Amino acid sequence: MIRLVTLAALPVLVLCQFDPSKWFMGSNLGGLQGFGVLPARCLNYLEAGYSRGNRLPSHRFFFNSTSGNCEQFVYYGRGGNRNNFRDVFKCMKSCGCKQQRNGGVPCNPPSQPVVRYYYDTFTKLCNTFQHTGCGGNSNHFKDWNDCFFTCGNGFET
């Protein structure tokens, strides 16, 4: 189910999936996992802005809601929209970490699932899950430290 709601006068997209066989391998809330709330700014399309005067373009990051990843682009210095971050950490903290966990799809040839960590926005904890090795989104990390320092309070600026 996809529903657009307003929280504190800010529109957000709420993504809910209910499947007790696939979601929440740890703390189980009846199969409802981590809410996956993406702020509206994360859903904006890429807007590179425009150049004026002798201002040099710079490399920035935007959240690609199709791929579920923070991606680099060239920003021309003026204009654009709020889906524009100075570094990948701010992009991840604002958007990437707020996605539901995604175990990916089986690779071809198949490989054994591996334990990865994802950030749960509901519990504000990094939890383990099985990743199949192919696909998924940017809310998966090789170890707890990477997860915590990217998404938790370990990387506050």
Swiss-Prot record:
Domain BPTI/Kunitz inhibitor: 42-95, 97-151
GO cellular component, one term: extracellular space
InterPro entries: Kunitz_BPTI, Kunitz_BPTI_sf, Prtase_inh_Kunz-CS, TFPI/VKTCI-like
SMART domains attached to this UniProt entry: KU
PROSITE patterns recorded: BPTI_KUNITZ_1 (PS00280), BPTI_KUNITZ_2 (PS50279)
Signal peptide stretch: 1-16
Record-level Gene Ontology MF annotations: serine-type endopeptidase inhibitor activity
Cellular compartment(s): Secreted
Protein name, per record: BPTI/Kunitz domain-containing protein 3
The UniProt record lists the keyword Disulfide bond: yes
UniProt xrefs under Gene3D superfamilies: Pancreatic trypsin inhibitor Kunitz domain (4.10.410.10)
Tissue: Nacreous layer of shell (at protein level).
CDD domains hit by this protein: Kunitz-type
Pfam families per UniProt: Kunitz_BPTI
Disulfide bonds: C42-C95, C70-C91, C97-C151, C107-C134, C126-C147
Coiled coil feature spans: none
Keywords: Disulfide bond, Protease inhibitor, Repeat, Secreted, Serine protease inhibitor, Signal
Ribonucleoprotein listed as a keyword: no
